[in-house]
Swiss-Prot record:
Keywords noted in UniProt: DNA-directed RNA polymerase, Nucleotidyltransferase, Transcription, Transferase
Annotated function: DNA-dependent RNA polymerase catalyzes the transcription of DNA into RNA using the four ribonucleoside triphosphates as substrates.
Protein's recorded name: DNA-directed RNA polymerase subunit beta
Cellular component aspect of the GO annotation: DNA-directed RNA polymerase complex
């Protein structure tokens, strides 16, 4: 048999017509790349670039003290090796992190008291420990306090400038009020907005508004400059009694003349009154040589003066810039002999007087007043001085410490406003603010468009690295304050950097982020798909994001720019819909945080293989064809008109205008949606449910890849890290259930070990208590290539994702048992463990040191029978492999009791028998109700300095043996490889020296070498210097490798023997893991991949299930009425194709059996050729072919990729090839009567999942249990072992039936009548059935509440009231 079968254990029949060009990026690249870029653990050549952690340190350091006599500089940072590896952290419940060491330099200056000149007095450098920095595991997760967590990426509004209007909601007239907002990455927001009167206002940080001109004054402009910035000017020159005004064809285009337009020079009428000046006529007038028109005084009235009109000799001001020209002003100007009046070019149509009007209403007219105004808005109640006001204004927008646009913000701003500031300019400039106001005024004038804030060019992704960077910066800033204070208070000449720094704030910021941030989530680890999806999730919630309540419909909706970037299907149902999304399959995040998707370039109508990644902004200007556009064999687009997307619209263009083309039809959906075959035939709502429910599928005992898949299964299995891929190519040396040893064959680097040991996980508990277990796929001696799958994990089979099982389905009603989506199952499913899953529950108990003495873990428990202790060892801990049930003891523990006053009898007994017998109580760890299972693992943790018990020592010995075995195996392979290389060098040589007994100059042969022990081979010396050098190098490397192996082993053993870090006051901790086997049962939830979910209603004996002509019974019966209204027809197509797959599988099985009998592979090859293409089978030997055929017995797996899969005709062809009816329907017989059903029934194989909503986890009953402290009513919920609430409506029901006594018990003895319920219990124990209800505790609570409000409420019992009446004097009674 050939040895390279790995990776070909299963071949899928592929239906896709469209060739895939682009490689799908690694699915968890988003997480890994982001965090790697933040940490940059290995310093690149030439130092680290200024990003990530480096930029954080650079931005906070250097720190100087208040008197500038000392400076603390940042030099570099390094990471040390983490103290524990990932598995140790998981077991010990600690964080997987590496110590961060920062090199700091303290420079002390001498300051000359007279001149103030500084000279360096002392420089000290030191490495300072700055806390531990969590590291990411291979799979893109973090281990925090022993649990796996994922940091979800956040979608937020990109920094930059945005223009918007209020959609006419603010003002009753429905007028659009435009607004601009500059959003920095951190710092103050600046809003510029119009009000209903068209005055422009500015707001800083959503505070009180000020006229925008005040802001411009504060920037250093004066009124005239402001007007000249926003308006052009026109000069009116006196010409006799009238005025001359220059003629500008562009400006007057579209102008309607109210009076005749007259040429100022010739006096001719160029345009008659009432006519409109078209672009053509305006141009013709200019061509005639008209340069100026005649204007009258009336034309000037109502215009605005463009500059201050001043008599420079006398200083008299005739008019200020912005003044409106009135008859009086015009007359006044004429009187002083002014011949030329500059006016602002405002025509109230194309250019509005908004800035001029704002200037007119602004109380301020200079910089000082404006600064004071801004100061009063920002800090009300503080008296401003010019210095403080200036400093405050500067710090708002121009101080890099406080204001950061970020590179993204700067790029976006430059693009939107056509500016050319460099990326490094992270603060605002005067030009930026002016450009924003200008753009806003242009919008009001009807030029330009507002921004769409849901466009993916305006939303960006913050991944782990960036979130962490912001958090760490906050921590360092807190630290900076403390450092400054400490620098001032200590003797700076004698201290080292270490003494100035307290790293707690920085470490606390990190801890807080990973422990309690909204974006740091407990990983969804139900199955490999749910892990991958969780890491690819994008959330709009979280700090700095939206809140559920505030998010409107637009934010949640699907946007055209989502195409290929965010999945339109996968999002939760419920309040988070649309706020939590998933990245599309090919999407990636670029350095600016925008999501990019790949396209193929199209040149002159020919599609190339060049792939480009574009963000939503870049894509907008191209014509993009679909991946399914028709091409000929030269890849030329064949259709006359191609359907394309451009800027969110769908249009039809000629092939030569197409710029780009999608790389794959599945690039618009997420990973989960891409796993649904025939997605294109499902309604979107059901596809959403299908995507979400695949993530809840429980890993089953036997994984079974789907007959009808999409080809994505292997990608998910590999990238999720569930299945193990070979790190290097090599030959399998050893295999057992717990590890695989591979000898690397292509390793040339002598410093690396020549062997890879892969440890397989066995029965580990996931975050969701599902079972993680891996099993090998390779055999000893097989050749393995790099990246080949060598072991399956949970929910994977042959390296493919396998979330459920293929079952034979019949779509028909069956006695009402599949009414309303219920599911009817055959008993075979239970008997053959088809849907059986293993769940691992973890229980832990701690022995603490209490005030009354230490708790003790022991087998010696008071008042417990020997029967109850049968599963415990001598240390009081349960054995591995024991079967336990609810209430069984897992770990025996006793706690000292408090001293209680002794009765005389006790004193007597104590005097007779000495020490009191039971001063301890039993606080053992017991199995909670509803759990039955097998103990699979026990871990014992001891505090430093506490003696280990026998159990802990046994566990430690086992672990050390396992480590020693690994070391010995690696050593053996090292020996074998090294000595084989040494033999190759020595054989054929005639050494001049050798070990004892060797005659020199004898030519060595392999047999001759074998006479000497291998360790003596190094003693041979040959003449050839080159060979000698090689042998010496080999020996040195061999010794080093041996030493390394031994050291690694000793380190691990030392860690094992060291005490554990336990919480304060805990002496010992025991964790017990129980494996629970859950068979499927009525009440469990199941689903297909198309959103077809239901609850198991009944499990029917096999003989009663409907059966086919050949006697095969259906496994599952679904209701056909669940299909039409839900419009998820994909499940029917899947059923048909699954039926064909099973039919073909039977044919292949027959051919394989024939081959095994006759050893003639021709019929088998023919059969396989009918199914697969030639290329897939080429080069396979007969034996390999038979092995692959053997894997196809149950069914031939197919792949039908989304939007590119099998069509109806393909399915029919497959059914025909399998010798089945083209309709996909069969005659079924009733299992109970043996009669055929009236009509043919759709029968086939469908892929069903068992979801993580198991009836065992939900069903619950209570008799006696805990009560709430205040109200004394039973608690609610399964976790609290609570009762069922009998609420207001239930009381109405009992009232309606007049069930008075039942109602009374419900409200008293079954709830919160404390004395009554005790009496009932005693009565039931006595066998008595009479009891009396008392006063419910909640009534007392009500009375107390009323008393607390000052109303004294007292109860008067009826007997006492009657007596009082009798004894009272007559007047009192009245």
């Amino acid at each position: 048999m050939a040895n390279t079968l790995v990776g070909r254990k299963r071949i899928r029949k592929f239906f896709g017509k469209i060739r895939e060009v682009a490689e799908m990026p690694n699915l968890i690249e988003v997480q890994k790349a982001s965090y790697d870029q933040f940490l940059m653990v290995d310093e690149p050549e030439g130092g680290r670039p200024d990003e990530g952690l480096q930029s954080v340190f650079k931005s906070v350091f250097p720190i100087s003290d208040f008197s500038s006599t000392a400076l603390l500089e940042f030099v570099k940072y390094t990471f040390e090796a983490p103290k524990y590896d990932v598995d140790e952290c998981r077991q010990r419940g600690i964080t997987f992190a590496a110590p961060l060491k920062v090199t700091l330099r303290l420079i002390v200056f001498d300051v000359d008291p007279d001149t103030g000149a500084k000279s360096v007095k002392d420089i000290k450098e030191q490495d300072v420990y700055m806390g531990d920095m969590p590291l990411m595991t291979e799979n893109g997760t973090f281990i925090v306090n022993g649990t796996e967590r994922v940091i979800v990426s956040q979608m937020h509004r990109s920094p930059g400038v945005f223009f918007d209007h209020d959609k006419g909601k603010t003002h009753s007239s429905g007028k659009l009020l435009f607004a601009a907002r500059i959003i920095p990455y951190r710092g103050s927001w600046l809003d510029v907005e119009f009000d209903a009167k068209d005055i422009v206002y500015a707001r800083i940080d959503r505070k009180r508004k000020i006229p925008v001109t005040s802001l411009l004054f504060a920037l250093g402009l004066d009124g005239e400059e402001i007007l000249s910035t926003f308006y052009n000017r026109i000069s009116y020159t006196r010409d006799g009694a009238d005025w001359r005004v220059p003629y500008d064809a562009e400006r007057l285009k579209g102008f309607k003349a109210s009076t005749d337009l007259i040429d100022a020079d010739s006096g001719e009428v160029v345009l008659e009154a009432g006519k409109k000046l078209t672009a053509r006529s305006a141009r013709q007038i200019a061509e005639k040589g008209v340069t100026a028109l005649r204007a009258t005084d009336e034309d000037l009235i109502g215009q605005y003066i463009a500059e201050d009109m001043v008599n420079y000799k006398t200083g008299e001001i005739y008019a200020e810039a912005g003044d409106e020209i009135s008859e009086k002003l015009l007359k006044g100007l004429a009187d002083v002999g002014i011949e030329e009046i500059p006016v602002l070019d405002i025509d109230h149509v194309n250019v509005g007087p908004y800035i001029r009007n704002t200037l007119a209403v602004d109380k301020n007219s200079n910089r000082e007043g404006a600064l004071f105004d801004i100061y009063r808005v920002m800090r009300p109640g503080e008296p401003p001085t010019l210095d403080t006001a200036e400093a405050m204004f500067h710090s708002l927008f121009f101080d890099a410490e406080r204001y950061d646009l970020s590179a993204v913000g700067r790029v976006k701003m430059n693009m939107r406003l056509d500016l050319d500031a460099p990326d490094t300019m992270r603060t605002l400039r005067r030009d930026d603010m002016l450009a924003v106001v200008k753009a806003l005024v242009d919008l009001r004038d009807g030029k330009g468009e507002i921004d769409d804030i849901d466009h993916l060019g305006n939303r960006r992704v913050r991944s782990v690295g960036e979130l962490m960077e912001n958090q760490y910066r906050l921590g360092l800033l807190r630290m900076e304050r403390a450092i400054k204070e400490r620098m001032s208070s200590v003797d700076i000449d004698t201290v080292m950097p270490q003494d100035l720094i307290n790293a707690k704030p920085a470490a606390a910021a990190v801890r807080e982020f990973f422990g309690s941030s909204q974006l740091s989530q407990f990983m969804d680890q139900t199955n490999p798909l749910s892990e991958v999806t969780h890491k690819r999730r994008l959330s709009a919630l979280g700090p700095g994001g939206l809140t559920r309540e505030r998010a409107g419909f637009e934010v949640r909706d699907v946007h055209p720019t989502h195409y290929g970037r965010i999945c339109p299907i996968e999002t939760p149902e419920g309040p988070n819909i649309g706020l939590i999304n998933s990245l599309a399959t090919f999407a990636r995040v670029n350095k600016y945080g925008f999501i990019e998707t790949p396209f193929r370039r199209v040149k002159n109508g020919v599609v190339t293989d060049e792939v480009v990644y574009l963000s939503a902004m870049e894509e907008a200007r191209y014509y993009v064809a679909q991946a399914s556009a028709a091409m000929d064999e030269n890849r030329r687009l064949t259709e006359d008109l191609v359907v394309c997307r451009r800027a969110g619209e769908v249009i039809v263009v000629a092939p030569d205008r197409v710029d780009l083309m999608d790389v794959s039809p599945k690039q618009l959906v997420s990973v989960a949606a891409a796993l649904i075959p025939f997605l294109e035939n499902d309604d979107a709502n059901r596809a959403l449910m299908g995507s979400n429910m695949q993530r809840q599928a429980v890993p089953l005992v036997r994984a079974d890849a789907p007959f009808v898949g999409t080809g994505m299964e292997s990608v998910v299995a590999r990238d999720s890290g569930a299945a193990i891929a070979a790190r290097r190519s090599g030959i399998v040396d050893q295999v057992d259930a717990t590890r695989i040893v591979i000898r690397a064959t292509e390793e040339t680097d002598p410093t690396k070990p020549g062997v890879d040991i892969y440890r397989l996980q066995k029965f580990q508990r996931s975050n969701q208590s599902t079972c993680i277990t891996q099993k090998p796929l390779v055999r000893v001696g097989e050749q393995v290539g790099k990246g080949d799958i060598i072991a399956d994990g949970p929910s994977t089979e042959f390296g493919e994702l396998a979330l459920g099982r293929n079952v034979l389905v019949a779509f028909m009603p069956w006695n009402g048992y599949n009414f309303e989506d219920s599911i009817l199952l055959s008993e075979r499913i239970v008997k053959d463990d088809v849907f059986t899953s293993i769940h691992i529950e973890e229980f832990e108990v701690m022995a603490r040191d209490t005030k009354l003495g230490p708790e003790e873990i022991t087998r010696d428990i008071p008042n417990v029978s020997e029967e109850a202790l049968k599963n415990l060892d001598e240390a009081g801990i349960v054995y591995i492999g024991a079967e336990v049930h609810a209430g069984d003891i897992l770990v025996g523990k006793i706690t000292p009791k408090g001293e209680s006053p002794m009765t005389p009898e006790e004193k007597l007994l104590r005097a007779i028998f000495g020490e009191k017998a039971s001063d301890v109580r039993d606080t053992s760890l017991r199995v909670p109700p509803g759990v039955t299972g097998t103990i699979v693992e026990v871990r014992v943790f001891n505090r430093h300095g506490v003696d280990k018990d026998e159990r802990a020592q046994a566990i430690e010995r086992e672990e050390i043996e396992r480590l020693a075995k690994d070391r010995d195996d690696e050593q053996a392979i090292l020996d074998r490889n090294t000595y084989a290389r040494l033999a190759d060098v020595l054989v054929g040589q005639a050494p001049v020296a050798g070990p004892k007994g060797f005659k020199k100059d004898t030519v060595l042969t392999r047999e001759g070498l074998a006479d000497y022990p291998r360790s003596q081979w190094w003693q041979f010396a040959v003449v050839d210097d080159r060979l000698m050098t090689e042998i010496e190098a080999m020996q040195k490397q061999y010794d080093e490798s041996k030493k390394r192996l031994e050291q690694r082993f000793l380190d691990k053993v030392e860690k094992l023997q060291r005490g554990d870090e336990l919480p304060p006051g805990v002496m010992k901790m025991v964790k017990v893991f129980v494996a629970v086997k859950r068979k499927i049962q009525p009440g469990d939830k199941m689903a297909g991949r198309h959103g077809n979910k239901g609850v198991v209603s009944r499990i029917v004996p096999i003989e009663d299930m409907p059966f086919l002509e050949d006697g095969t019974h259906a496994d599952i019966v679904l209701n056909p009425l669940g299909v039409p209204s839900r419009m998820n027809v994909g499940q029917i197509l899947e059923t048909h194709l699954g039926w064909a797959a099973a039919g073909l599988g039977r044919q292949v099985a027959q051919a394989v059996d024939a081959y095994l009998r006759s050893h003639d592979a021709t019929p088998l090859r023919e059969q396989m050729r009918r199914i697969y293409s030639e290329a897939e089978l080429d080069g396979l030997s007969d034996q390999d072919l038979a092995e692959i055929g053997n894997n196809l017995r149950r069914g031939v797996p197919m792949a039908t990729p989304v939007f590119n899969g099998a069509k109806e005709a393909d399915i029919e062809a497959m059914l025909e090839m399998a010798g089945l009816d083209r309709s996909g329907q069969s005659t079924l017989y009733d299992g109970r009567t043996g009669e055929p059903f009236d009509r043919k029934v759709t029968v086939g194989y469908i892929y069903m999942l068992k979801l993580h909503h198991l009836v065992d986890d939900k069903i619950h009953a209570r008799s006696i249990g805990p009560y709430s402290l205040v109200t004394q009513q039973p608690l609610g919920g399964k976790a609290q072992f609570g009762g069922q609430r009998f609420g207001e409506m239930e009381v109405w029901a009992l009232e309606a039936y007049g069930a008075a006594y039942t109602l009374q018990e419900m409200l008293t003895v079954k709830s919160d009548d404390v004395a009554g319920r005790t009496k009932v219990y005693e009565a039931i124990v006595r066998g008595d059935d009479t009891f009396e209800a008392g006063i419910p505790e909640s009534f007392n609570v009500l009375v107390k509440e009323m008393r607390s409000l000052g109303l004294n409420v007292e109860l008067i019992s009826s007997k006492r009231a009657a007596n009082d009446q009798l004894e009272a004097p007559p007047e009192a009674a009245e």
